[in-house]
Amino acid sequence: MTDQWEHNRLNFEGVWQGRSQWYVRQVDGELDLRQPTTVVENTRYAISFEEADTGLWDGTGLFLAPGGAAQYPLSRSTYNGSGACWQFQAAGGQSSLEVPTELPRFGHEINFFCGRSRSMLVLLWKPDGSEWRLNAIGAVAFRCQLSEEEEPSRAQHSSIEALLAPLQGCSGVIERFEPQPGVAGQASEPEPISWDPQPFLEAEVHGVFADGLVCGVPKRLPGSGFRLEVGCLQPLRFQQLSIVFDDQRRLQCWERRAFSIA
């Protein structure tokens, strides 16, 4: 059975390059999702695995890293030591496990894979007085530079309604994964579901981004349970990742939905 380390390798191995678009809250307090505030033309993640249990993560053109670059080793023995990483087939990332009391930010990285494309959305909240306020969203349409044929770019939709329209009447499956340290965790067995656009449409903040990415999230984190919704419209399917927090604002589970589009 494929463990979390193997899912990580199967999902992320490659030389990923793309254009980073960042939407950052301005000094007037507004987060405008119509136009990025910062664009990094060549964000590049080279993720390699020389052996079955070790690898290297090497990134350049990074918006958040000091000097725009970072490098660190990868190892099965240390992977996911905190339980903050999650992997499904063709989707993976990492999350803050609770709304922190002292840390400077609350963040999530979500990646959706399709062939040799990787669509990444980053969500960041920062303290604003006694509240946590959405501070930045980053979107990157990565393509693997090792692929013989580069996956074509996807047009950005004009609205969330336009992006979600092809899903009307679709059915799919849902899997759940609960936080746990190490590599042994397994997602639940897939269960059938029907498409419901309301978690996106009813969110306080919703937007569409490059590569078919979409989100529906709160502007300010609630004092009790809440959900973060992120999705990606890919050729022939839509993937949705729900990040579910309980009333103590601790991460309860990740839910991955997949819908086939005729």
Task: State where each predicted segment sits.
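Soluble ligand-binding/transfer domains with enclosed cavities or grooves
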Residues: T2-E13, Q17-A262
